[in-house]
Regions:
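Non-catalytic interaction surface on structured domains
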Residues: 29-39, 83, 95-98, 210-212
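Alpha-helical cap/lid subdomain in secreted, periplasmic
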Residues: 120-283, 287-301
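Short N-terminal signal/transit or membrane-insertion segments
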Residues: 1-11, 63, 68-70, 77-81, ...
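Solvent-exposed, flexible loop/coil residues
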Residues: 34, 45, 52, 87, ...
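Serine-esterase "nucleophile elbow" of acetyl-processing enzymes
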Residues: 46-108, 113-125
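A generic short-segment signal for beta-strand/edge and adjacent turn/coil regions
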Residues: 34-41, 72-74, 100-105, 172-176, ...
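Detector for Asparagine
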Residues: 3-6, 20, 35, 86-88, ...
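N-terminal secretory targeting modules
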Residues: 1-70
Length: 301
């Protein structure tokens, strides 16, 4: 993706995320490495990044035992790759805003099917259901762009399955043949999340998340980081697929949110927020998104 040598020079804290990046299978789902402790961030015993509430770092397990709690479901942008300080993540900012803890349920390229499974397990096994859910579905699309492979029920191969999936198929299929299954997949599982929230009276906000590719005017540090410039043929294909189909994905998510009568919050198809790399927000960008999410969530609480 971006020129990480430049990024680490311009943003030294990113080194901590590179050095401590670890992906672990739980069943067929990738999570982050458990019990990571470093200056920039930490994870709990199941690999979820700690959230901060009233100055205390809390694990997912601790948060779901609270009298009142929220969940932020999503991919690595929710986890906060490159964003130093657990207190600066989406979940911590929403906790600060609403006065109760939010858990950081971020997975590597976390897709809506796997996030639905986590949500269902929390509702079924916890003493109380969450008081709020924010769902960021952008991982459905960004994961697809690695391989141009999608199944309408199961989605795209995870990051550790890419080589195997491409070998099975003899290479990447044309993305225009696979975008419809991808859109069917994201529609199915966003609806599933909305339906379970509605059936249990949980306020839900869908995030209209965005990437550097939709930014209208890059900042100086983003230009110096060479964001958006591919450095190998695989990235060239990935970035081209993203640019070609991001409007299709954005429009489908908007249609689904409208049909479900669920708020869709975020900057939309274009943005002017800050990025660490093409897919991860800096501190100001994260806060800007959370302001949008909070404005949509507040009337529901």
């Amino acid at each position: 993706m971006a020129n990480y040598q430049n990024i680490m020079r311009l943003r030294p804290e990113v080194r901590q995320f590179i050095r401590n990046r670890r992906w672990v299978h739980h069943g067929d789902v990738l999570t982050y490495g458990a019990n990571v402790r470093c200056e920039a961030f930490s994870t709990d015993e199941t690999g979820f990044r700690h959230s901060v509430f009233e100055g205390e770092s809390l694990s997912l397990r601790q948060i779901i035992l609270a009298e009142r709690y929220g969940l932020v479901l999503g991919p690595s942008s929710v986890y906060g790759f490159g964003l130093a300080g657990n207190e600066n993540t989406m979940s911590s900012l929403l906790a600060e805003r609403f006065g109760f803890p939010f858990a950081n349920v971020g997975l590597p390229e976390g897709n809506s099917r796997n996030l639905f499974s986590i949500l269902l397990s929390i509702i079924a096994r916890s003493p109380r259901p969450p008081s709020a859910v924010v769902h960021i579905s952008g991982g459905d699309f960004t994961n697809f762009c690695y391989t141009s492979i999608a199944d309408p029920v199961f989605g795209s191969p995870n990051l550790k399955q890419i080589a195997m999936a491409l070998e099975e198929r003899g290479g990447r299929p044309p993305p225009e043949q696979q975008i419809k299954p991808l859109l069917a997949f994201t529609s199915l599982w966003i609806r599933a999340i909305a339906q379970i929230c509605r059936s249990t009276d949980i306020p839900l906000v869908l995030a209209d998340d965005t990437t550097f590719f939709e930014k209208t005017d890059p900042s100086d540090i983003e230009r110096q980081s060479e964001l958006g410039q591919p450095f190998n043929p695989s990235q060239d294909r990935q970035f081209a697929t993203h640019r070609r189909f991001v409007s299709d994905y954005h429009n489908r998510r908007k249609e689904v949110a409208k049909s479900l009568e669920v708020p869709l919050a975020g900057p939309g198809i274009t943005n002017d927020i800050g990025f660490v790399d093409e897919f991860h927000y800096d501190r100001d960008g994260t806060r800007s998104l959370c302001d949008d999410f909070a404005a949509a969530l507040e009337p529901l609480l």
